[in-house]
């Protein structure tokens, strides 16, 4: 009886072990951690230009003036580690300085922000091992659409949420809205990763694989955010070594960790499809044997 149970358990766990082995093999072959390091470096160079462009877009639409402040607080409270307040002050100071730049300098900021999106495009297509390339004009249009529509849609969603919460007559509804807003960071991460894994690769990505990979990445991102915040508060080694400059390595480690999660979600997405193809090929080969 016990032997039968072990045999059944082995049959159920064998596909999981095979998939995990394939996942690890792809992570090693794609040099995922090196790609994450490259993206972290480009992200740090593009962070201030990207935020400057986003805030400039909000400034161009007066109806989003109040929402831009809420969006700033929401991003730094939900997508940054425990030192988000310090990082926010520094970044806002850098952005304020960038607003004094000339038109040529502003164009340079936009180009730098677009370079980050190009780096993301290259990294994800490296993981998908896609040989196809998009026309440059089409790629630029996609990058620009993400750069402009993304922040505006986020601002619109926050404006709607604030409006609903301001309706005092809907006291029964406020409890439901509070619960929705509590899971909003996870939901936004899930949707963002799903769009990233579905749109950016130049090859066709099965929707269910993108949903699963995005969900795992979103869960790891939320868990990593809380774990990183706990590490910073419980083991303040960076503050002890670097003092007031501790925000620099903390930000770099957090950005690197974030890109590791994003690329791991991409590896999971592509491995699900590859494992399914390998399994179907093995079953077909077994069926063809006399």
Curated annotation (Swiss-Prot):
It is found in: Cell inner membrane. Coiled coil: none annotated. InterPro entries: UPF0761_bac (IPR023679), Virul_fac_BrkB (IPR017039). One of its GO terms (cellular component) is plasma membrane. Keywords: Cell inner membrane, Cell membrane, Membrane, Transmembrane, Transmembrane helix. It comes from the Bacteria. The chain crosses the membrane at residues 44-64, 104-124, 140-160, 183-203, 210-230, 244-264. It is a multi-pass membrane protein. Its main location: membrane. The keyword Transmembrane helix applies. Belongs to the UPF0761 family. This is UPF0761 membrane protein YihY. It comes from Salmonella arizonae (strain ATCC BAA-731 / CDC346-86 / RSK2980).
């Amino acid at each position: 009886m016990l032997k039968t149970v072990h045999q059944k358990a082995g049959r159920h766990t064998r596909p999981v072990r095979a998939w995990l082995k394939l996942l690890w093999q792809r992570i090693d072959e794609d040099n995922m951690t090196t790609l994450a390091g490259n993206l972290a470096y480009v992200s740090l160079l593009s962070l201030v230009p990207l935020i400057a462009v986003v805030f400039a877009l909000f400034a161009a639409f007066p109806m989003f003036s109040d929402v831009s402040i809420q969006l700033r607080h929401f991003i730094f409270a939900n997508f940054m580690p425990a030192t988000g307040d310090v990082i926010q002050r520094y970044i806002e100071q850098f952005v304020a300085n960038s607003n004094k730049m000339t038109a040529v300098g502003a164009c340079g900021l936009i180009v730098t922000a677009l370079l980050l999106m190009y780096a993301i495009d290259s990294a994800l297509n490296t993981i998908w091992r896609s040989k196809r390339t998009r026309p440059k004009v089409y790629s630029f249009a996609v990058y620009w659409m993400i750069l402009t529509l993304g922040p505006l849609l986020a601002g619109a969603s926050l404006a709607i949420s604030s409006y609903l919460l301001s309706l005092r007559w809907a006291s029964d509804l406020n409890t439901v809205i509070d619960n929705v807003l509590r899971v909003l960071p996870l939901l936004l991460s899930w949707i963002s990763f799903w769009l990233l894994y579905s749109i950016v690769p130049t090859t066709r990505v099965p929707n269910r694989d993108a949903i699963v990979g995005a969900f795992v990445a979103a869960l790891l991102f939320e868990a990593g955010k809380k774990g990183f915040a706990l590490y910073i508060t419980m083991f303040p080694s960076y503050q002890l070594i670097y003092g007031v400059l501790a925000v620099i390595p903390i930000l770099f480690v957090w950005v690197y960790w974030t890109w590791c999660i994003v690329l791991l979600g991409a590896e999971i997405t592509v491995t699900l499809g590859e494992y399914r193809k390998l399994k179907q090929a093995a079953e077909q080969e077994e069926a063809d044997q006399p």
